[in-house]
Structure formats: C-alpha cells, structure tokens
C-alpha cells in the first residue's frame, strides 16, 4: 500500500492505495454518456507511456525513433511528455482544489485539455488532472514529477494467485441493463483482437459458438481473407480443463498484468480478467429454486436477461493503438489491415 504526496510540500494527496494493472480501457472514449470511475476505490495504476504535451507529428518523429519507443506503425502524433502518470479513482484524492482557469471540457465536465486542473491545497502546485467529461472514464491522473509515492502502513493485500482468480474477482457482464454493450468489453475485445490477428498469421481461425463468436466473429470475418480455417481458438486458463489447441484466449492478471501462459507451444492471446471470467464461468440464471420446486400455481416473474440492441463492435481506437505496439504489425498483410482501419475512421468494417 502507498499514498501519494505533493513533491513540493509533502502534503498528502491520496488515501491509501494499492497498485494494480492499468486497464486497457484507460484511454478509451465511449459514446456521449457519463462513464463511471476507471479505477476501483483503494487502487492505483501507472501508465508507462509518455502522456501530454509536447506532441510531435509522425512525419517529424520517423519510424526509427518511434520503434525505439515501442510504436511500430504510424500514428497521427506521439506524446513526448513525461511517462509514469498515476491514475486513481476521484474519491481517493485528498487535499486538492480545482484550478478554475483550467476547468475546460468538451461537453458537461472536465477533459484536461488545458493541462493539470487540480492543485495542492497547501502550496498551490498543479499536481493532477481530473477527468469527468462525457465519453471518458472518470479518473484523476497524478502528474509525474509533481507527486511522490510514499509507502503506507495500511494492510497489504496478498497477491492473488492464478488458482484463486475466479474466487477473488468477478466477471463483468457483457450487456448493460439498457441493452448497450459494456464499454469495458468493447475495449478488452479490441485489444485482444489485435493480439489474435498477430498470431493468426493471416489465416482464418475457428471460434467456439457463443459469446466468443458473438464478440470476435464479425471482426475476424471482416479482417481476414476468405478460405479454410487453419487454427482454432479456445478459452484456456486457471480452473478450465487443459485444451490442445493452436491459440488460447487467456486471462491477464488484474493486479500484476501478467498473462497466464498455457502449457506447450500454444499461442496465448491476453484478455482482461473480468471479461475472461465471464466467458469462462458465465453466471446462468437458475430456472427453479435450488431446493424443492415452485409452489403450485406460482409463476416466475423474473425479468428476461438483457439483450443487446445492436451487434457487438470491438473498440476501434483501442484495437489500433494495441496493434501499433505489436512488432508483428510490420508484416505486410497486418500492416495493410492497420492502414485500412486507420485511414477510414468512419468506414469501420465491423
């Protein structure tokens, strides 16, 4: 556990928080609704990539310098700000005040366009950026260099082992009560889709029927050329029986970010743990009580399970950002997919 303090005056800026993996949806933009908090209360994550100004266009950066930073396909621009921004839930901040002249946003909240908009209440130093505008996950991003991490005496949670993953973490339902697809699912599948394409070698893959086909199938049909399926994708991970297949969809540990490794030479495609858990261990509604039966003349009036009002669509921006950071994107067939998707933002094939 740790707290973050002002680097200038040592005032405490957060409650006691524990480090977890950065969610793949951290920089996702979704619809025009207010989104909930990105981070669970009592947790923080670190973004290893540079963030914020100055920005340099791709034409100025060049492929060689970009590859040295782990970006293997063109992006509009790259940040040359400081890496290591820390993100916490808004409710975990302490001793900060808004900077009124920096409280700009696109719609009905703050989006950080004017730079850090939270100051230390003790010394006035700009220390963080509050994000709560529509389309963004609500979060507070602590500015690298303006804050300092201090170990805390709070209880340290034991690192979750793989075998206890299903017991200590819950799966996220794919569909919201309103019938919209869960934004975290769209981001998670978008990131996993990039990895799945990179290990497919450009050949069609077979998916099991059900939620995997519903979430990955349309995108793979649109992006891979027609032809016979050469490889099969299955769910694999802790709590599931061993599967002898070519490609395994495996969980990414929610605390460490470690990817579960299947035995042998099976290619692993990482998927966010909350999405993987729902795919691997779906919670089905029981048709009758666990014990006994329904009394005579009594009918169930439970609401029907939510049904989506549109087809599933992996998040395009998360997909492209993930694909640009995979060395395999330099292969001509995969680079062609990336270029087609990037150059036609309003003509998404799936």
Annotated model-derived regions:
Residues 74, 81-82, 102-265, 269-271:
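Domain-exit/linker segments immediately C-terminal to small folded modules
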Residues 1-106, 110, 317-350:
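An N-terminus-focused feature that recognizes amino-terminal "leader" regions
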Residues 50-53, 176, 180, 271, ...:
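Alpha-helical structural elements
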Residues 60-63, 167, 186, 190, ...:
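Intrinsically disordered, low-complexity regulatory segments enriched
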Residues 243-350:
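Extended, amphipathic alpha-helical scaffolds
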Residues 54-57, 161, 180, 184, ...:
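Residues in intrinsically disordered, low-complexity segments of regulatory proteins
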Residues 3-5, 12, 17-20, 24, ...:
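Extended aliphatic helical segments
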């Amino acid at each position: 556990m740790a707290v973050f303090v002002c680097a200038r005056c040592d005032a405490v800026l957060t409650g006691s928080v524990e480090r977890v993996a950065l969610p793949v949806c951290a920089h996702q933009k979704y619809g025009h609704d207010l989104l909930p908090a990105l981070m669970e209360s009592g947790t923080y994550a670190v973004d290893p990539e540079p963030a914020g100004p100055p920005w340099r266009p791709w034409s100025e950066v060049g492929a060689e310098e970009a590859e040295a930073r782990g970006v293997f396909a063109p992006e509009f621009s790259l940040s040359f700000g400081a890496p290591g921004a820390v993100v916490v839930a808004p409710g975990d901040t302490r001793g900060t005040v808004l900077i009124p002249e920096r409280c700009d946003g696109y719609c009905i909240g703050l989006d950080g366009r004017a730079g850090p908009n939270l100051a230390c209440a003790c010394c006035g130093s700009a220390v963080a950026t509050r994000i709560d505008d529509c389309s963004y996950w609500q979060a507070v991003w602590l500015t690298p260099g303006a804050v300092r991490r201090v170990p805390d005496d709070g209880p340290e949670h034991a690192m979750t082992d793989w075998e206890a993953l299903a017991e200590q973490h819950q799966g996220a339902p794919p569909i919201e009560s309103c019938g919209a697809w869960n934004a975290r699912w769209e981001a998670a599948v978008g990131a996993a889709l990039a990895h799945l394409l990179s290990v497919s070698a450009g050949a069609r893959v077979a998916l099991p029927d059900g939620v995997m086909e519903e979430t990955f199938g349309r995108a793979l049909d649109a992006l891979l050329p027609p032809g016979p399926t050469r490889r099969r994708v299955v769910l694999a991970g802790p709590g599931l029986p061993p599967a002898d297949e070519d490609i395994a969809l495996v969980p990414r540990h929610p605390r460490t970010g470690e990817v579960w490794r299947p035995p042998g030479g099976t290619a692993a495609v990482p998927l966010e743990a909350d999405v993987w858990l729902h795919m691997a261990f779906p919670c089905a509604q029981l048709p009758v009580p666990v014990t006994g039966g329904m009394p005579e003349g009594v009918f169930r009036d439970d609401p029907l399970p939510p049904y989506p009002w549109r087809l599933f669509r992996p998040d395009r921006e998360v997909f492209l950002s993930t694909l640009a950071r995979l060395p395999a994107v330099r292969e001509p067939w995969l680079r062609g997919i990336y270029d087609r998707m990037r150059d036609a933002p309003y003509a998404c094939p799936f």
